[in-house]
Amino acid sequence: MSSREIRIATRKSALALWQAEYVKARLQEAHPGLVVTLVPMVSRGDKLLDSPLSKIGGKGLFVKELETALLENQADIAVHSMKDVPMDFPEGLGLFCICEREDPRDAFVSNTYASLDELPEGSVVGTSSLRRQAQLLTRRPDLQIRFLRGNVNTRLAKLDAGEYDAIILAAAGLIRLGFEDRISSSISVDDSLPAGGQGAVGIECRSADIEIHALLAPLHHADTASRVTAERALNKHLNGGCQVPIACYAVLEGEQIWLRGLVGEPSGGLLLSAEARGPRASAAELGVQVADALLAQGADDILRAVYGEAGEE
């Protein structure tokens, strides 16, 4: 690879390709003349669509194949949804850029009802996320939560076919793919705390590729990175992945970060929450602090039970 060419490893889903094309456009805008090509591939998480993520188990379901491409020099960077990125990286790889965050909220999507509060008792709601399930059932224990996997188009098609009264998706994905008009309402973070990193795009590359790091620098968004650093530190301290009922969300208040964290039973029976404020420069330490507060309330018992159920399948 020359310094004027970058190969982007990406999943083949419409949203992943949008994110890769976004990074490509930003790179070429920042570096006129730079040649950028996409290397699409299929991840394990894309292949196993007949099971909930929590039952498949393991971390890095959507990134390992892309990381292999980096390690084998088949690509120079990999573009990820930050909520899918594991806390630890293979030796020789690292996260060197986080782009500006899109709307981090969850979106309520229905062809009949305008909001979660309007759903009649016993309505069927589709989601593949234990995090969303735990918060939904705490607020509305009468709802029937039904398994929903697949790409954004597939999920919308299942809703349109009448399989669900409503579905919950990340607002960012709908906005990026031009489906903003399908959002019946955005769910406040007070009612559905997002997943760590939700709405943010991250770029992974080889740690030794200094030229690549320099090319990525104009795409890095420091405010988003500070927020996501706090969220990921919480997740890491709880040993969380993208398929467990952990939520966390950080906002900047000047040079302070306000971080909220949550761990919930998938049944909605118990929802633990904690929050703290601290200096932006200590984002990672703040994540550990909030995670410790959750552990002190018994979060590890909830997470052990979830991992145990995944292991029994």
Swiss-Prot record:
Q: Which NCBIfam families match?
A: hemC (TIGR00212)
The terms under GO molecular function for this entry are: hydroxymethylbilane synthase activity
| Protein's job | Tetrapolymerization of the monopyrrole PBG into the hydroxymethylbilane pre-uroporphyrinogen in several discrete steps.
Which GO cellular component terms, listed alphabetically, does the Swiss-Prot or TrEMBL entry include? cytoplasm
The protein's name: Porphobilinogen deaminase
Q: Which residues carry this modification: S-(dipyrrolylmethanemethyl)cysteine?
A: C242
Would I find Transferase among this entry's keywords? yes
Q: What else is known?
A: The porphobilinogen subunits are added to the dipyrromethane group.
| Entry note: cofactor | Binds 1 dipyrromethane group covalently.
> What range does the record give for the signal peptide?
none
Is-annotated flag, keyword Hydrolase?
Answer: no
Q: Which reaction does it catalyse?
A: 4 porphobilinogen + H2O = hydroxymethylbilane + 4 NH4(+)
Q: In which pathway does it act?
A: Porphyrin-containing compound metabolism; protoporphyrin-IX biosynthesis; coproporphyrinogen-III from 5-aminolevulinate: step 2/4
Cofactor(s) named in the record: dipyrromethane
Which species is listed as the source?
Pseudomonas fluorescens (strain ATCC BAA-477 / NRRL B-23932 / Pf-5)
Name the enzyme's class: transferase
- Summary of subunit composition and partner proteins: Monomer.
Cross-referenced PROSITE patterns, in alphabetical order?
Answer: PORPHOBILINOGEN_DEAM
Primary gene name: hemC
> Which example biological process does GO assign this protein?
protoporphyrinogen IX biosynthetic process
Known EC number: 2.5.1.61
